């Protein structure tokens, strides 16, 4: 199901906007599985390849450009970062996958950390699988999607940096074929941290997790 701001009703958009105008703060970081905290609040996670724009997107929807550290260098996020939104939601920023320019041991550590969290979090309500609009769906993205399905995790696909793509027709076809292969149906959104395209619809979808 392709989703955009027009497809989300006004009530949901308003609820999402109100929630994400609330106070949000960093509450924990985990560099290994033993450091992962157990919150009593519902969690929403952002996962994707290195430099896909996870931190920028989190800053955009939370209206705080300094919340999650942003870098043009892939592999900047080296731990799981947890943010508390108004004592109603925990936003989870996962390390990027697929970054080659780190020692193999570090890369494996990140993969174990990401996989463990996605498999074992008791409060995880929704995973946002971020994919660079300019690059399309890659093998690593498919592996993560398959991991989520195997563990019965609900997810939606977020194409980032949509302002840099003129025609999304090919992407639409690609993602529909991808979902058909997985035998899965979910929201698909196009967002841009620069132009704010899609931010409102994304906030509305995340706000629904409070009642899930």
From Swiss-Prot:
GO function terms (MF aspect): GTP binding; metal ion binding
Alphabetized UniProt keyword annotations: Cell cycle, Cell division, GTP-binding, Magnesium, Metal-binding, Nucleotide-binding, Septation
Required cofactor names: Mg(2+)
GO BP annotations, alphabetical order: division septum assembly
CDD domains for the chain: YihA_EngB
Location of the EngB-type G domain: 40-212
Annotated Mg(2+) binding sites: 55, 77
The keyword NADP is assigned to this record: no
Binding site for GTP: 48-55, 75-79, 93-96, 160-163, 191-193
Region forming the signal peptide: none
Keyword Iron-sulfur found: no
InterPro entries: G_ENGB_dom, GTP-bd, GTP-bd_ribosome_bio_YsxC, P-loop_NTPase
Family the UniProt entry places it in: Belongs to the TRAFAC class TrmE-Era-EngA-EngB-Septin-like GTPase superfamily. EngB GTPase family.
Function comment: Necessary for normal cell division and for the maintenance of normal septation.
NCBIfam families in UniProt: GTPase_YsxC (TIGR03598)
PANTHER family: ENGB-TYPE G DOMAIN-CONTAINING PROTEIN, MSS1/TRME-RELATED GTP-BINDING PROTEIN
Descriptive protein name: Probable GTP-binding protein EngB
